């Protein structure tokens, strides 16, 4: 079984190689409008470089980043995507019409097998040069946000009173103590007069009303 899968894999690889070699040889004839050492006319250069759908080789993993358990054959596919120049730094080449195309791709799962399946890819059919609105808006937002943040920080630092962090008066029975935030001095909530009214006396260490010692 493994031998058969390997044979199929190498046969497909050979067919792909022969197909690529055939088109590589035919390409100069198909696109041979210009001869060697010939000067390409301005209008031809302008039309071919302006914003338009251009065949681009796109990595499959770029379109399907979650399919990491597979190896794809081929690893990239030819897609029509917007590209070219807009002749203005404030413009960018963006798609205005799109459609999906389905292609047969070989999926290989190492040590498990392989199969040819259908995968959908996005293609651009129409492109236009449009203002970089989103990018400019984001830049303005980030600049504006930074300024507001700095103002808030300045306001906070201007009106925030200076204070020294105080340690707790006691780990146990904190509710019996009161602390001065300026001096960090701890004092008892109970008073000596309050303890005496109950025929008790104030223990300044624990801030509790204890029985008088005899």
UniProtKB/Swiss-Prot annotation:
Organism, scientific name: Canis lupus familiaris (Dog)
Compositionally biased region (Basic and acidic residues): 131-142
Keyword tags: Angiogenesis, Developmental protein, Differentiation, Disulfide bond, Glycoprotein, Growth factor, Heparin-binding, Mitogen, Secreted, Signal
Name used for this protein in its record: Vascular endothelial growth factor A
Keyword Glycoprotein: yes
Described function: Growth factor active in angiogenesis, vasculogenesis and endothelial cell growth. Induces endothelial cell proliferation, promotes cell migration, inhibits apoptosis and induces permeabilization of blood vessels. Binds to the FLT1/VEGFR1 and KDR/VEGFR2 receptors, heparan sulfate and heparin. Binding to NRP1 receptor initiates a signaling pathway needed for motor neuron axon guidance and cell body migration, including for the caudal migration of facial motor neurons from rhombomere 4 to rhombomere 6 during embryonic development. Also binds the DEAR/FBXW7-AS1 receptor.
Disulfide bonds: 51-93, 82-127, 86-129
SMART domains reported for this sequence: PDGF
Region (Disordered): 131-162
Gene Ontology CC annotation, any one: secretory granule
Transmembrane feature ranges: none
Gene, per the UniProt record: VEGFA
